[in-house]
C-alpha cells in the first residue's frame, strides 16, 4: 500500500510539473511599453536599495499576473496588462490562466 501511494503521488507531481511547464503564462508574452516604464519607475524609486527593488518588481510581476483575470484588482491593471485590460485581445485569450479563470 505504501509503494502504491508513493507511486501515485510521484505520477501526480510529474503531471503537475509538465502541465505547469507547458501552460502559456503572461510572462511568455512580450512586455508592453507601459509595463517596462512601471518597472523603470520601481527601480528608480528604490534608490539603489536592491531589497526594495526586488520587492517592488515582485509586486509588479504578481499584479501583472493577477490582472489577467481580474482587471478591477488595482487601478493600474490597464498599464500592467494592456493586452487584457480593459478589453481582452487574442494574445490574452490564449493564456491558460484566462481560459481557466
From Swiss-Prot:
Coiled coil residues, start to end: none
Chain ranges passing through the membrane: none
Chief place where the protein resides: secreted
Bridged cysteine pairs (disulfide): none
Protein name, per record: Kappa-scoloptoxin(10)-Ssd1a
Domain of life: Eukaryota
Annotated tissue distribution: Expressed by the venom gland.
Keywords: Disulfide bond, Ion channel impairing toxin, Potassium channel impairing toxin, Secreted, Signal, Toxin, Voltage-gated potassium channel impairing toxin
Naturally occurring in which organism (per UniProt): Scolopendra dehaani
Protein localization: Secreted
Amino acid at each position: 500500500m505504501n509503494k502504491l501511494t508513493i507511486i501515485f503521488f510521484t505520477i501526480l507531481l510529474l503531471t503537475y510539473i509538465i502541465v505547469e511547464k507547458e501552460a502559456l503564462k503572461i510572462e511568455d508574452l512580450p512586455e508592453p511599453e507601459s509595463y517596462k516604464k512601471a518597472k523603470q519607475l520601481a527601480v528608480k524609486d528604490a534608490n539603489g536599495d536592491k531589497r526594495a527593488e526586488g520587492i517592488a518588481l515582485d509586486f509588479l510581476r504578481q499584479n501583472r499576473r493577477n490582472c489577467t483575470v481580474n482587471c478591477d484588482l488595482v487601478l493600474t491593471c490597464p498599464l500592467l496588462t494592456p493586452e487584457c485590460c480593459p478589453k481582452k485581445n487574442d494574445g490574452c485569450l490564449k493564456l491558460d490562466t484566462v481560459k481557466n479563470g
